[in-house]
Design a protein with these regions (language model features):
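Active-site neighborhood of thiol-dependent amide/isopeptide-bond enzymes
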Residues: 148-219
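Bacterial N-terminal signal peptides
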Residues: 10-21
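Linear, non-domain "peripheral" regions
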Residues: 5, 22, 26-125, 295-306, ...
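Active-site beta-strand termini and strand-to-loop segments that position acidic
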Residues: 217-220, 356-358
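Bacterial N-terminal signal peptides that target proteins for export
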Residues: 1-9
């Protein structure tokens, strides 16, 4: 989910965040204030003190200023006969802060304790589990699988958000929540994937819609969409790692209302070369393909079978009817005692069939 800012305007002075250096003090017009704020944010300063000596609309300024990189800011102000003294305090977005620390090690001392823990934990994970000899695709898959298995979607936080309840606890929106608590909403998943992929040498970007967040990953010279959050939820549902939202194109991804990017200037994702199902022969173009793929997988010993179904919204599939052939499967003389399935729909292109054998 998107970051949420809280704004406080009070008539007394207090410092709510520890400044990493003595707060800068400047006398500012609107333009000078904007420059001072941009410099403070670029330097990850904890605080900035500004004296306004020009008459301008502060509310309009705040509405228009781009606080990119800041997860929370607070403004405390007091007006004298001559000017307005403003003290700005900042806390920084997890990905912004860690990116700065990776670009310049001196910024590590400016990370919050939790951000420092995330960076340390991710470095240890990459060192232990992701050797340099792996391809970027293999690194991405390993990270995807790890997060799908070890992180669960935070339903309670999501329900609160949908109900308009805004909590002071932003942990579920962070990589810290995903990696240390094992629960997160989409932003936490995307942040964790970003840190792990970046430390593994895989270029990626966080993509935001109005209600969701995921990653755009560069593999070779092409880009693909990766939504670990939705694959993790399907993994919990089916009991096996799912790849429904693993390396999709723009066309495939943006069919879903939640996947309408608001980011400007994203590179196009137009290759199916890294789609898991397409590369493994698990792509069905019609019902005959569905039967062929499931039968072959069953005979090979698979009991939890997922496949991509093209154009499933166009054709009149009745999966309760169309999967009756499963009862006739007898791999190694074993019979199907029961089976369950998760069918394709408006928000997924994969069919998952789980077989229980006698």
């Amino acid at each position: 989910m998107l970051n949420r800012f809280k704004i406080y305007a009070v008539v007394f002075l207090t410092a709510l965040f520890i400044a990493f250096a003595p707060p800068a003090e400047v006398s500012a017009s609107a333009g000078e204030l904007a420059d001072a704020l941009r410099t403070a944010i670029e330097n990850m300063d904890g605080s900035l003190t500004v004296y306004e000596d020009a008459d301008f609309d502060l509310d309009a300024f705040v509405e228009e200023f781009d606080f990119a990189g800041v997860s929370k800011w607070e403004l405390n102000s007091a007006r004298s006969q001559r000017d307005l003294r403003m003290v700005w305090d900042f806390a920084y977005n997890e990905v912004y802060a860690i990116r700065k620390a990776l670009e310049d090690a001196s910024f590590e001392q400016k990370l919050s304790p939790r951000q420092a823990q995330v960076l340390s934990e991710c470095r240890a994970f990459v060192k232990k589990n992701i050797p340099d000899k792996l391809t970027d695709y293999e690194k991405e898959k390993l990270i995807h699988d790890y997060l799908c298995v070890n992180v669960s979607f935070d339903e309670e936080t999501e329900e609160e958000r949908l109900s308009g309840i805004i909590s002071d606890d932003i942990t579920p929106y962070t990589a810290y929540g995903a990696l240390f608590n094992g629960t997160a909403v989409c932003e936490g998943y995307a942040n964790a994937a970003w840190v792990l992929l970046t430390l593994s040498g895989v270029e990626n970007h966080i993509v935001n819609s109005d209600t969701h967040a995921w990653n755009l990953v560069k593999l070779g010279s092409r880009y693909c969409h990766l939504d670990v959050t939705w694959d993790s939820s399907e993994t919990d549902l089916t009991g096996t790692i799912q790849y429904t939202y693993f390396n999709l194109t723009d066309e495939q991804m943006t069919r879903y209302p939640e996947h309408q990017p608001v980011n400007a200037g994203l590179p196009p994702a137009d290759s199916e070369a890294y789609n898991m199902y397409f590369n493994s022969g698990m792509r069905a173009g019609n019902l005959a393909d569905v039967e062929r793929i499931i039968t072959a997988a069953c005979e090979a010993g698979e009991r939890n079978i997922s496949l991509w179904v093209d154009d499933h919204l166009t054709f009149d599939y009745d999966w309760q009817r169309d999967l009756q052939f499963v009862w006739d499967l007898t791999p190694g003389g074993n019979y199907v005692e029961s089976f369950m399935f998760v069918e394709p729909g408006a928000d997924r292109d994969t069919l998952t069939v789980i077989l229980y054998m006698r």
